Amino acid sequence: MAENGAKVIHPRAVELAKNADIILQIKNTYNPTFEGTKIGPASMLKDAYEDSSKTKFMSAVAHRDKIAQVKVIGSEEDFSDILNEMEDRHINMDMINFLTEKKAFALDVSNLDEVENILKQHDVEYEIKPDCAKVTLIGNKVTETPGVIAKIMRALNAENITLLQSSDSYNSLSCLVDEKDMVT
């Protein structure tokens, strides 16, 4: 969740607890009687996990602003060279969508000038949208739950928000939107 922008707990702390078979219990300082969130090996949390998986689909929403969307149209060879240059310069990409005719990805705006310089060196068409935000829904078995993207699209459409790009994993679904549409 932290890597998606949530202000929760450092991933290294989770890793240390996992390696030592320790259950972390995250409490709410404003409501100490609330049970909070337990993080630990699935075998140790089996009962709690099974109960919550039946009742809760989404468990958190995280967000990050200052994201840029980059779309590139060019040959596979050019794009491979671009990726190599980005790797050499330690520029991370996120929300990667590679289609036959175009490639799209998101990145932190702090890397935008450097990426644009790389793109200008190659014979590719590109489009950059700098004022974006990533909203991530974190939940249980996201990719195994039918209709998730349809529900998200209905919610976005109801608020006249354009979905610029999306990506998913087993436990999360991220939506790239205009930064002005993200309300924190």
Language model features by range: what are they?
Residues 1-168, 172-184:
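C-terminal catalytic "cap/lid" subdomain
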